[in-house]
Amino acid sequence: YYPFNFELRIEVSLKSNCLEFEISIYNKSDFPMPINFGLHPYFNISDFKNLEFINSPLNCLNQEKNIISNTLDELNNINLGVDLLMYTSGRSIFRDKVFKRQVSLIHPYPFDIGVIWSDPPRRMVCLEPWTSPRNSFVDGLRNIMIPSKDSRRFDASIQIKSLN
């Protein structure tokens, strides 16, 4: 049960090698409305051993163990399954050396929290843009409030580049 009347609009545009998302959340209620919003795009991969992550932050939060850890060390375990939250520059990028492609998630502030998630044996990786970390409604960390009768807009895009 979510005690607010709201409208969520996601406009998706397909461009050459790019999928653009324009997200609008409108608070129709008479009270300020807290939000924590994210997308969950999954990407087919050749194999975990063929992935290379580009310009990832030095540290991340291992959400399974709830500990801060070195991002590269954690990504070395992606074939075992990971759930990693990071405060990014607004870009999350990986390359698949066998599929010869680079996937870039562009997710500017306040959509710049990134989660990398894998669930072996499924050959996929999830790059998720988020506005706030887990439990933001409870602890207030990066909690976003939309005033009554107002809206908030978020943008993200996924770009695919051939590495041939």
Regions found by a protein language model. Name each.
Residues E7-R9, C18-E20, S89-R91, K100, ...:
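Intrinsic-disorder/low-complexity, polar/charged segments enriched in Ser/Thr/Lys/Arg/Asp/Glu/Gln
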Residues R9-E11, L141-I146:
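Beta-strand-rich interaction surfaces with strong enrichment in secreted/lumenal proteins
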Residues I23, M145-S162:
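Short Pro-Gly-centered flexible turn/kink motifs
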Residues P32-P34, P41-P108:
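Active-site/ligand-binding surface loops and adjacent short beta/alpha elements
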Residues D96-R134:
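Glycine-rich active-site loops that engage anionic ligands at enzyme catalytic sites
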Residues R134-G140:
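Short beta-strand and strand-turn-strand segments in soluble, beta-rich domains
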